[in-house]
A protein has these predicted regions:
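A short, Trp-centered hydrophobic/proline-enriched beta-strand micro-motif
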Residues: 1-6
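Long, acidic (Asp/Glu-rich), low-complexity accessory segments flanking structured domains
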Residues: 92-111
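Short, solvent-exposed loop/turn segments at the edges of secondary structure
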Residues: 14-16, 43-45, 55-56, 84-86, ...
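Alpha-helical interface subdomain recognition
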Residues: 88-90, 115-279
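A structural signal for short hydrophobic beta-strand segments in well-ordered beta-sheet cores
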Residues: 19-23
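Flexible, small-/acidic-enriched active-site or ligand-binding loops
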Residues: 16, 68-97
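Short Gly/Pro-enriched turn/cap motifs at secondary-structure boundaries
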Residues: 9-12, 38-41, 53, 78-85
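A short core secondary-structure module
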Residues: 28-72
Length: 279
């Protein structure tokens, strides 16, 4: 499946969507018109969650790939994450059964954000893990590489680079463990047999949205710093595709953009702190 949110005129401002959905005369189908861009898994997905305006009410729909009027554009040629599909999706009088409204008309906002919140948290975890993996790769190279008749790992400048990389990874890791623990503890207090269990889980995710934003910003920027310094430690070898840093350098960049840019996440964090006046 895929999550079709972004539009040419609605990136960070997702609620400014111009994709429209109008109920047909028979009231059996919504007719969708518009386009979504930069959609991950767009070329492969059998099921697509699409957001559109129903009389200015932001609404989520479940679209299947064989629906009339659904058109998949060409693959984007990206800087990195080349193994992932990224495509533009077109909705040209796309017929969507009324029962395929996800939730209710007008509930698209909470649905969209409750996908973004855990996505940010998971991105914080995976980028931190990537940073630690690259630190190990840079360490292996530093121990093996010799200049001036000794391992470059003995040079103070190189030691300083590793000290900074490790400190940043620990900072990111700490936020991830704290957030994971808080969410896990809150969920453990819910009754799994309660009909409202999943609504409770959703509420917990919403309540930890700020931690998720912090984890995303820290993790993605830790990975960015680490891969940049990793290239520097490896010197010319870091610029060669046969070594791990080159691919990581390209793949890393998107992490500061998707799931909400780091600038947007900083606005969310800052706004929350100023509103609540607490840490």
């Amino acid at each position: 499946g895929c999550f079709a949110l972004t539009e040419p005129g609605a990136g960070s401002d997702v609620l400014a969507a111009s994709t429209k959905a109008e109920l047909n005369e028979e009231k059996t189908h919504y007719i969708l018109n518009g386009q979504k861009i930069y959609i991950t898994n767009g070329s492969w997905a059998d099921v697509i969650v699409v957001f559109a305006m129903v009389k200015n009410k932001y609404t989520a729909f479940i679209v299947e790939k064989d629906f009339e009027g659904y058109v998949i554009g060409s693959e984007e040629k990206k800087l990195g994450i080349k193994g992932s599909s990224t495509a533009t999706l077109f909705f040209e009088n796309c017929k969507v059964p009324v029962e395929n409204v996800l939730g209710e008309v007008g509930q698209g906002g909470p649905i969209a954000f409750n996908v973004l919140y855990p996505g940010r948290y998971k991105l914080g975890v995976t980028t931190c893990a990537g940073a630690k993996y690259l630190i190990k790769g840079a360490l292996d190279f530093a121990f093996e590489r010799e200049q001036f008749s000794r391992s470059i790992s003995n040079f103070d400048m190189v030691k300083n680079k590793f000290a900074n990389m490790v400190a940043k990874s620990w900072e990111s890791d700490s936020v991830n463990y704290m957030t994971t623990g808080a969410i896990d503890q809150a969920i453990s207090k819910l009754d799994k047999n309660d009909d409202n269990f999943y609504a409770g889980v959703q509420k917990i995710i919403e309540d930890h949205s700020i931690e998720s934003s912090i984890a995303k910003v820290l993790g993605s920027e830790t990975l960015a710093y680490t891969v940049d310094e990793g290239v520097q430690v490896m010197g010319g070898a870091g610029f060669i595709e046969d070594y791990p840093m080159a691919g990581a350098y390209r793949d890393e960049r998107i992490n500061r953009i998707f799931e909400g840019t780091n600038e947007i996440n900083r606005m969310i964090i800052g706004g929350y702190v100023l509103k609540k006046s607490i840490l």
